């Protein structure tokens, strides 16, 4: 079960705003050895939680790619997410009311700052492997830049150094869908539910691609309505709205847009040059959201960066689905 780390001091955000207090939900697997040298930290993506054994099945667990008998695995729920960390559904201690849309905007750097505070509370001085895909890769990258001596090995999947105009446009389109749901502005916990469903359906088009749907959502030859692709989009939207919150999704997408390792560091190349970790960058050939060229850039400018490209029909979601291929590449480059 997840635990809660409570940071009682005011938590200042990159934009100058302050959270009066901060809670970070996290989970651990395995045991920390005496030398504290067996830590693997997993950073999760947009709507995931702090239990990677659930959403990265086959990669994390006993006798899996990352063996919990050998390693101490930590995963923390990010700020703004509705799985236990401080988020728009939380109570503002200064007002006694739910934050809602009064929650401050935050950045990927703020998320990384919260992870560092948690690691200090857990007395973890060094991380053997830091792993993250998509938005999780953004966090891992920032952390490796901010604390280069702390991270020994870094694995980045389907991510980038700066969120692209394409990615920002997709996120803005999803926020427009959420905002078009008039209930989004109400205080109820499930407000904006229909807007969130539409946003998820939009997002899915960038997570998959033409070939994904061509292979997985094929109709009978004479079908004239009630197409599988239509049903699938609605199903995925409803599936997310049952477990997630529209306001949290809105804020997390804004945080994703903020990602730019070069901000106030000269540029992205100079920022990436600060990373000391042995780094494996994994791209998915068919990824529309984070094209291969973005991972090629990372591998080129991270001093010890190496690039591997996975062939998959699943697009961006390949970083979650192609577990066997990922496992093989990780073991090819590292002794786990």
Curated annotation (Swiss-Prot):
Main localisation: cytoplasm
One Gene Ontology CC term in the entry: cytoplasm
Binding-site positions, substrate: 200, 317
InterPro entries according to UniProt: AB_hydrolase_1, AB_hydrolase_fold, HAT_MetX-like
GO MF terms, alphabetically ordered: homoserine O-acetyltransferase activity
Subcellular localization, as worded in the UniProt entry: Cytoplasm
Coiled coil, from the record: none
Keyword Signal recorded: no
Domain of life: Bacteria
Quaternary state and interactors: Homodimer.
HAMAP family linked to this entry: MetX_acyltransf
Functional summary from the UniProt entry: Transfers an acetyl group from acetyl-CoA to L-homoserine, forming acetyl-L-homoserine.
Protein name: Homoserine O-acetyltransferase
Annotated source species: Psychroflexus torquis (strain ATCC 700755 / CIP 106069 / ACAM 623)
């Amino acid at each position: 079960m997840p635990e809660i780390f409570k940071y009682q001091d005011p938590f200042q955000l990159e934009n100058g705003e302050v959270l009066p207090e901060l809670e970070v939900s996290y989970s651990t697997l395995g045991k920390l050895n005496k030398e504290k040298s067996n830590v693997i930290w997993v950073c999760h993506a947009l709507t995931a939680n702090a239990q990677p054994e659930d959403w990265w099945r086959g990669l994390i667990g006993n006798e899996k790619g990352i063996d919990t008998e050998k390693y101490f695995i930590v995963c923390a729920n990010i700020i703004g997410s509705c799985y236990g960390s401080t988020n728009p559904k939380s109570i503002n201690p200064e007002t006694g009311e739910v934050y809602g849309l009064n929650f401050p905007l935050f950045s990927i750097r703020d998320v990384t700052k919260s992870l560092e505070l948690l690691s200090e509370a857990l007395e973890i001085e060094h991380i053997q492997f830091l792993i993250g895909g998509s938005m999780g890769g953004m966090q891992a990258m920032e952390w490796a830049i901010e604390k280069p001596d702390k991270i020994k090995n870094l694995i980045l999947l389907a991510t980038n150094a700066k969120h692209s105009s394409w990615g920002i446009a997709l996120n803005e389109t999803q926020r427009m869908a959420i905002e078009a749901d008039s209930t989004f502005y109400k205080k109820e916990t499930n407000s904006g539910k229909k807007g969130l469903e539409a946003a998820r359906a939009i997002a899915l088009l960038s997570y998959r691609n033409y070939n994904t749907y061509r292979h997985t959502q094929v109709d009978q030859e004479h079908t004239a309505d009630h197409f599988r692709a239509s049903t699938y989009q609605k199903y995925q939207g409803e599936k997310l709205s049952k477990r997630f919150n529209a306001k949290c999704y809105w804020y997390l997408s804004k945080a994703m847009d903020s990602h730019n390792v070069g901000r106030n560091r000269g540029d992205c190349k100079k920022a990436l040059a600060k990373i000391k970790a042995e780094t494996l960058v994994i791209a998915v050939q068919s990824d529309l959201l984070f094209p291969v060229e973005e991972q090629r850039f990372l591998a080129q400018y991270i001093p010890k960066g190496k690039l591997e490209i996975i062939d998959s029909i699943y697009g961006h979601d390949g970083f979650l689905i192609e577990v066997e291929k990922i496992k093989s590449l990780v073991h090819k480059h590292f002794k786990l």
